Amino acid sequence: MISPENITGLILAGGRAQRMGGIDKGLISFHQKPLIESAINRLKNQVGPILINANRNITKYAGYGYPVVMDETPDFSGPLAGFSVGLKACKTSYLLTSPCDSPLLPLDLAARLAAEMERGPFDLVYASSLESGKTWAQPVFCLMRANLQDSLTAFLTKGDLKIDRWFKELKSSTVIFDDAQAFANVNTPEELKILEAAL
């Protein structure tokens, strides 16, 4: 059984947030608290150590008491850049990733992905959501083995940043969650208002 203590949680807060006008999304107020706090609160009981991937406002993020890891590639290279530094800093056998702007992330995310991982063997298990009869991949919500660093480094060296293409090189599986809203994220000011109003 994969215990929470053997999983490091990585909160991805290193994006450019162009559709939000370049504002650091992790620090945007959601019900009067920064979004990063919602991510921490929903993840902290599911994992052991927590890391925050951020590329600006480092002091503010560090103030939450968790190590902050910055991308090693320039220009806000996307979630795989965050995965890479998270894997390098990970000291447990597994790494669970989640974005900072999904304040309703499932409270059983780690447990369900870990159960599927044990059913494998798999290199990586990611979440999918069911909405209107369709299944949608949610690849930034994933549990991966911490020994994937070499694979990811080789992939990034090719200049590819597409998360789905890296997944195709691995033995992966997915877990379908019925609550699509659990993966709702904030990409625009309008989406922020809608999500706040829904709670």
UniProtKB/Swiss-Prot annotation:
<dbReference type="GO" id="GO:0046872">
    <property type="term" value="F:metal ion binding"/>
</dbReference>
<keyword id="KW-0479">Metal-binding</keyword>
<dbReference type="Pfam" id="PF12804">
    <property type="entry name" value="NTP_transf_3"/>
</dbReference>
<feature type="binding site">
    <location>
        <position position="101"/>
    </location>
    <ligand>
        <name>Mg(2+)</name>
    </ligand>
</feature>
<keyword id="KW-0342">GTP-binding</keyword>
<dbReference type="GO" id="GO:1902758">
    <property type="term" value="P:bis(molybdopterin guanine dinucleotide)molybdenum biosynthetic process"/>
</dbReference>
<comment type="subunit">
    <text>Monomer.</text>
</comment>
<keyword id="KW-0963">Cytoplasm</keyword>
<keyword id="KW-0501">Molybdenum cofactor biosynthesis</keyword>
<feature type="binding site">
    <location>
        <position position="25"/>
    </location>
    <ligand>
        <name>GTP</name>
    </ligand>
</feature>
<keyword id="KW-0808">Transferase</keyword>
<dbReference type="GO" id="GO:0005525">
    <property type="term" value="F:GTP binding"/>
</dbReference>
<dbReference type="InterPro" id="IPR013482">
    <property type="entry name" value="Molybde_CF_guanTrfase"/>
</dbReference>
<comment type="function">
    <text>Transfers a GMP moiety from GTP to Mo-molybdopterin (Mo-MPT) cofactor (Moco or molybdenum cofactor) to form Mo-molybdopterin guanine dinucleotide (Mo-MGD) cofactor.</text>
</comment>
<dbReference type="InterPro" id="IPR025877">
    <property type="entry name" value="MobA-like_NTP_Trfase"/>
</dbReference>
<feature type="binding site">
    <location>
        <position position="71"/>
    </location>
    <ligand>
        <name>GTP</name>
    </ligand>
</feature>
<dbReference type="InterPro" id="IPR029044">
    <property type="entry name" value="Nucleotide-diphossugar_trans"/>
</dbReference>
<keyword id="KW-0547">Nucleotide-binding</keyword>
<dbReference type="GO" id="GO:0061603">
    <property type="term" value="F:molybdenum cofactor guanylyltransferase activity"/>
</dbReference>
<feature type="binding site">
    <location>
        <position position="53"/>
    </location>
    <ligand>
        <name>GTP</name>
    </ligand>
</feature>
<keyword id="KW-0460">Magnesium</keyword>
<protein>
    <recommendedName>
        <fullName>Molybdenum cofactor guanylyltransferase</fullName>
        <ecNumber>2.7.7.77</ecNumber>
    </recommendedName>
</protein>
<comment type="similarity">
    <text>Belongs to the MobA family.</text>
</comment>
<feature type="binding site">
    <location>
        <begin position="12"/>
        <end position="14"/>
    </location>
    <ligand>
        <name>GTP</name>
    </ligand>
</feature>
<feature type="binding site">
    <location>
        <position position="101"/>
    </location>
    <ligand>
        <name>GTP</name>
    </ligand>
</feature>
<dbReference type="GO" id="GO:0005737">
    <property type="term" value="C:cytoplasm"/>
</dbReference>
